[in-house]
Amino acid sequence: MRVTVTGATGRIGTQLVGVLRRRGDEVTVLSRNPDKARAALGVEVHAWQPESEPAPTDALAGRDGVVHLAGEDVAQRWNDDVKRRLLSSRELGTRNLVAGLRAAEPRPGVLVSASAVGYYGPRGEERVTEEAAAGDDFLAQICIIWEREAAAAEQLGVRVVRVRTGIPLDKGGGALAKMLPFFRLGIGGPVAGGHQYMSWIHLDDLVGIYIAALDGSEWSGAVNGTAPAPATNAEFSKALGRALHRPALAPVPSLAIRALYGEMSRIVVTGQRVVPQRVQALGYSFSHSELDEALRSALAG
């Protein structure tokens, strides 16, 4: 299979490229920094400024599939400039990718585009499947626009899969990496009461879902990239403490999270109980469906 990947130097993209190469696929990467990407990944890399130009057709024509992961990192303190980048990197980047697909001949057969469980907004204890309506907060609005731009490729005859990603378990980045220093010191614990759900997923399974979406002609539309058993923040904290053999009893008040992350803290102190109903119906078998085992694996990797 010939696959083009954007956002390939991030934690998800790096592992995805590695898995694709190990199974014998030919991988091409689109990157803002081609020298860095080439050195890190050892694959063919084409320069692309996603917010200002269509994706280069020579990196798309004749490919079997495209995986679109590029976008500004959400896990940072938001201000007006960061919020602008969060939206424009996804809206314009995806629009310009589809513009490149429109000009490519022959076109790839499938586009697998990242989205996020933030699409649903805060949902409390509701069990959220792919059929649930979108939320109305800032992150939900970004996801709606992001998915709309990706879905435009369907008009070109391209099969489109939108992966609403949860919280990847990766000690090298993301939410888990930010939690680890506190838990290792024995000062970690539930955040804002710990009742909010965390829709986690092992990085191996998230990459597995992207590959299944590339390979499977029956995959289309939105799928939830989460493990089957979301946990409350309190349950997650206890499991992480067990994995590290450290106590996890120090509660973190919501005021402290708001002081640290500002508006972005809403993602941390609220949550969604998201389940991968369509992913399981499509036959995907999770390698890491139990939280304690998944955390041990992620920390050992």
Give short role names for the model-derived ranges.
Residues 266-301:
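C-terminal amphipathic/interface module of NAD(P)-dependent oxidoreductases
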Residues 3-23:
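N-terminal Rossmann NAD(P)H-binding glycine-rich loop of SDR-like oxidoreductase domains
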Residues 216-263, 296-301:
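Mid/C-terminal beta-alpha module of Rossmann-like enzyme folds, strongest
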Residues 178-201, 205, 212:
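A conserved pocket-lining segment of Rossmann-fold NAD(P)-dependent short-chain dehydrogenase/reductase
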Residues 35, 39-93:
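NAD(P)H-binding glycine-rich loop region in Rossmannoid oxidoreductase-like domains
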Residues 156, 169-178, 213-223:
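Glycine/proline-rich active-site loop of Rossmann-fold NAD(P)-dependent oxidoreductases
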Residues 95-137:
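Conserved Rossmann-fold NAD(P)-dependent oxidoreductase catalytic core, especially the SDR/UDP-sugar
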Residues 115, 148-171:
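Conserved beta-loop-beta element that borders a ligand/cofactor-binding pocket
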